[in-house]
Amino acid sequence: MNQTKFLLPESEIPTHWYNVVADMPNKPAPVLGPDGQPISPDALSAIFVDSLIEQEVSAERWIPIPEPVREIYRLWRPAPLFRAHRLEAELGTPARIYYKYEGVSPAGSHKLNSAIAQAYYNREAGIRRMTTETGAGQWGCSLALAGQMFGIDIRVFMVKVSYQQKPFRQIGRASCRERVSSPV
C-alpha cells in the first residue's frame, strides 16, 4: 500500500524562510508607485515596518525565522502533506503529485503563516494597532488572531457581501477589536 499522508515532526519546522528571488535568473520588476516610478524603501515605510521592507527587497536566499514566530507555528505546523494518488491515476501521469493541507491552522488557511510574522515584526517595531482589509474574511481573521497573540489591536474592513454571508468567521469576532463592513 502506498503512503498517502506524511507528517513531519515539530523539530523539522524550518528555521529560515526561502526567498525564491535569490534563484530567479530574471529578477521581478520593481513595484511601481502612483507616479509610475519604482517605489523606494523609504516610500514603503509609510505602511510597512523596516524589518518587513528589508525582507521584501532582499535578494538573500534564506531569511531567519524569529524563534517567537516558530513557537507559534508549532501550534499547528508542520501541516500534513498528502500524495494525490487518485489524481495521478486520473491524469495518467508518472509524476508524483503532493499537496499540503493548511486547513489545520486555527484560521483554516495558509494566511495565518504570514499574519503571525507580520504581527511579530510590527510588535517588535512598537506598533500597537494595525488596520487591514479582507475579502471573504480569511486574511482578516488571520491577522486578528495574530494580533491577539502579539498584543496588537486589529481593525478589519470587510467586503459587505462577505460580512453578511459569512457570520461563521467567528474567530474574527473573538480576536478582532473592530470589524467594519464596507458600505457596498
Model-inferred region functions:
Residues 1-179:
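PLP-dependent amino-acid enzyme catalytic core
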